């Protein structure tokens, strides 16, 4: 949804354009200048409202003390905190988290999740409920630990505030006027909405955007189909837990029609037949194929063979003895091997990052693995492997924990689609096909081992009847697209920004560049004066 001031939006419309700010946010890094933190978010802006009533946190690593530090102290006596973590039941990490829970001043429930071998509970999701009965879903890339939020690059997608459907009520208590859906509908077109929460948490302009949708010539059923599909897919994901019945029943009562995103999730299991395209790489492949087919109807927006697909993440698994998984991945991403680039930091980029070698503890690749060296060599020879370059994005020294997958036009001006997700480049996260070979004894299906969550965005999601056609473009150091002279061809269109955390075009590894792997000791000190691993 657009976060532009109404006056600013009108100015752009006078130029026959409509601008929509990036639905993707980056995390705010306090050590960076303000010019590189424009539109960036703190964890406190997501869970720090004095109106927070209940929060469901789904994550891998959790520091409960850090979580509470980012909540408003006034909610401690009443807030209900539910945490689904990724720790093994016998791990020291879970023991520490349990000890924190036993000594904290808040009502906290912890939930463990079974995952098969090689799998993890890796999703990063928040479902926040507020005292006015509003709700917000946040899908992001950060663990709930301080280093992830203060020193690593992360991405955040947050839905608009969601409210109960007109015929549903979550409580019999009086609801403030700004939180009552029926009251909001009576004020269509008005921006005089009051809210006693932090203005950083609530975008009044989101309400403005919703009012605009209500006045569109299409029926509300047409406008809400994307959001209802998101709701259906998100609830299907939640059904894979044993402890989320209460949450599912609650979310069924909410109106998701304002959401413009596709939920892409992974859950453990082997998925056969139609279910193969319900999760992970199978679902992404199905949607992207439909997108590419649909794009051929419009010469100005169709996918081109020269397009560049980019995968960027903070962990790389094994691609197999002959790197056969690369073919599965590129097929899923809908691109040719020669047009696929993979961004992963070098040793030098980790060493010079804001947290120094410590950043590398969150960036995983086992170079000592049986086929790891040949895998890197294959990626280099294919000109697929690229460095972490983020000068234009303002994140060069903020090492990546973010995971992004995108398809660019060759000149980098247009984005065909964007995926922000917790999923790294691995078989457990995305899934791998079983039983598809001629002599295979097992049935065909997609095998996934981890829990992952992400959102897919593409221009058509933002289209509305009797409005300009939509295009999507990268933005740097801001969420707002910049229509300068070189983008005059954008005039007359609805332009959606996508906040970039790294630079286009990607820069390939040189022969001297060494891929980062935390299993290798480093005697060279980082800029903070530490070796790796540190002697703490």
Curated annotation (Swiss-Prot):
Task: Give me the residues that bind substrate, please.
Answer: 124, 403
Q: Where is this region: Interaction with DNA?
A: 315-318
| Gene Ontology molecular function: any one | 3'-deoxyribose phosphate lyase activity
One GO cellular component this record assigns the protein to is: nucleus
- Annotated site location: Interaction with DNA: 426
A Pfam family annotated for this UniProt entry: Tyr-DNA_phospho
Q: Which SUPFAM superfamilies match?
A: Phospholipase D/nuclease (SSF56024)
Q: Which compartments does it reside in?
A: Nucleus
- Active site at 122, 401
Q: Note the CDD domains from the entry.
A: PLDc_yTdp1_1
**Which top class of enzyme applies to this chain?**
hydrolase
EC number per UniProt:
3.1.4.-
- InterPro entries hit by this protein: Tdp1
Record keywords, A-Z:
DNA damage, DNA repair, Exonuclease, Hydrolase, Nuclease, Nucleus, Repeat
Q: Which GO terms describe its biological process?
A: base-excision repair; DNA repair; DNA topological change
Q: Give the function comment from the record.
A: DNA repair enzyme that can remove a variety of covalent adducts from DNA through hydrolysis of a 3'-phosphodiester bond, giving rise to DNA with a free 3' phosphate. Catalyzes the hydrolysis of dead-end complexes between DNA and the topoisomerase I active site tyrosine residue. Hydrolyzes 3'-phosphoglycolates on protruding 3' ends on DNA double-strand breaks due to DNA damage by radiation and free radicals. Acts on blunt-ended double-strand DNA breaks and on single-stranded DNA.
Q: Which family does it belong to?
A: Belongs to the tyrosyl-DNA phosphodiesterase family.
Q: What is this protein called?
A: Probable tyrosyl-DNA phosphodiesterase
């Amino acid at each position: 949804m657009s976060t532009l001031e109404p006056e600013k939006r009108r100015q752009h419309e006078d130029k026959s354009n409509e601008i929509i700010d990036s639905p993707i946010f980056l995390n705010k890094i306090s050590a960076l200048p303000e010019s590189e933190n424009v539109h960036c978010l703190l964890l406190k802006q997501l869970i720090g409202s004095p109106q927070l009533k209940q929060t469901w946190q789904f994550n891998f690593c959790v520091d409960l003390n850090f979580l509470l530090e980012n909540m408003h102290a006034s909610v401690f006596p009443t807030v209900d905190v539910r945490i689904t973590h990724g720790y093994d039941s016998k791990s020291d990490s879970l023991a520490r988290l349990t000890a924190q829970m036993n000594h904290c001043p808040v009502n906290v429930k912890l939930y463990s999740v079974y995952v098969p071998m090689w799998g993890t509970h890796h999703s990063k999701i928040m479902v926040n409920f507020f005292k006015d009965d509003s709700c917000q879903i946040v899908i992001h890339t950060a663990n709930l630990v301080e280093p992830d939020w203060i020193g690593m690059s992360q991405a955040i997608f947050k839905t608009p505030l969601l409210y109960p459907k007109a015929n549903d009520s979550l409580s019999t208590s009086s609801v403030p006027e700004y939180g009552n859906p029926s009251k909001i509908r009576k004020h269509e077109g008005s921006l005089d909405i009051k809210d006693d929460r932090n203005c950083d948490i609530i975008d009044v302009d989101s309400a403005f955007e919703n009012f605009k949708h209500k006045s569109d010539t299409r029926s509300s059923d047409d406008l809400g189909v994307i959001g209802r599909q998101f709701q259906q897919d998100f609830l299907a994901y939640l059904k894979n837990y044993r402890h989320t019945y209460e949450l599912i029943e609650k979310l069924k009562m909410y109106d998701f029609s304002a959401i413009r995103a596709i939920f892409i999730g992974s859950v453990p299991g082997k998925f056969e037949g139609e279910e193969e395209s319900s999760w992970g790489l199978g679902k992404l492949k199905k949607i992207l194929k439909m997108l590419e087919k649909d794009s051929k109807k419009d010469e100005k927006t169709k996918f081109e063979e020269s397009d560049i697909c980019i995968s960027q993440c903070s962990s790389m698994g094994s691609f197999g003895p002959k790197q056969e998984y690369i073919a599965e991945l590129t097929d899923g991403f809908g691109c040719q091997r020669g047009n696929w680039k993979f961004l992963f930091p070098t040793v030098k980029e980790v060493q010079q990052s804001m947290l120094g070698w410590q950043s590398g503890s969150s960036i995983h690749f086992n170079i000592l693995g049986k086929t790891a060296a040949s895998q890197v060599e294959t990626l280099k020879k294919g000109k697929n492997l690229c460095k972490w370059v983020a000068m234009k994005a303002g994140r060069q020294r903020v090492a990546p924990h973010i995971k992004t997958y995108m398809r660019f036009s060759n000149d980098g001006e247009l984005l065909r689609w964007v995926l922000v997700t917790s999923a790294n480049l691995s078989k457990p996260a995305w899934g791998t096909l079983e039983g598809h070979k001629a002599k295979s004894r097992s049935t065909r299906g997609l095998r996934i081992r981890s829990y992952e969550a992400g959102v897919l965005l593409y221009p058509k999601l933002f289209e509305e009847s009797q409005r300009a056609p939509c295009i999507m473009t990268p933005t740097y150091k801001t969420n707002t697209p910049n229509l300068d002279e070189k983008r005059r061809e954008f005039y007359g269109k609805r332009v959606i920004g996508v906040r970039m955390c790294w630079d286009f075009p990607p820069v390939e590894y040189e022969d001297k560049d060494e891929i980062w792997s935390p299993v290798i000791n480093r005697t060279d000190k980082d800029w903070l004066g530490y070796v790796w691993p540190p002697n703490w």
